[in-house]
Amino acid sequence: MSSIYTLSYDKETNQIIRTVKEIFSKNINNNKELSVLIDKYFIPQELEKKSNAEVSTPFKLRQEMLDKMPIEFWTTPKKVFEPCSGKGGFVIDIIDRFMIGLKEKIPDEKERYKIIVEDCLYFSDINPTNIFICKLLIDPYNKYNLHYNEGDTLDLVIKDKWNIDEFDAVIGNPPYNSSGNTGTGNTIWQNFTKKSLNKWLKSNGYLVFVHPPGWRKPNTEKGKYY
């Protein structure tokens, strides 16, 4: 089946690639600057918004969400899944949290970074362009064994894909529905929530999502899902 998504290697894209590689080469732990760069340059295109309800999650909101997790979470290697990675905002933020949290346990920056991206981080997206960008941001020189899925995350079986059973945390901003218009299309955010709670997440794990508030209210229709 042909994809509606294509990779466009135009002059602007090549400049972004050069910029990302330059930032990365200057400081392997410069993840906050990379994260801000995502907000500035990697904005979902109209096709991505309409076909897959893709939206950017602002840097400030991402930080507020991650701040709600215990600081201690990041002080030991754990498995974290971003199921709708988009252009990589949460992915880079997760790396940054681990880089800070694991500093005492793993003082060497390069060793720490390798452990994080190879043992702690997992991500998925339906859009191959997004996967390309995430891989570029994380590993511009193809040095690491990354764990990613290119395809519909709701069809993903993590045991088959990565030979793991559960994650310590699932973090992201799942699409609200199957189109970019909240008034049309089938709502799918609850499918990401259900699968996170029932299939992906440890019983004592953390689910950190942007979502409508209804599913937390048992007396609402959405709340009946749970």
Segments predicted by a language model, with ranges:
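SAM-dependent methyltransferase catalytic region
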Residues: 1-226
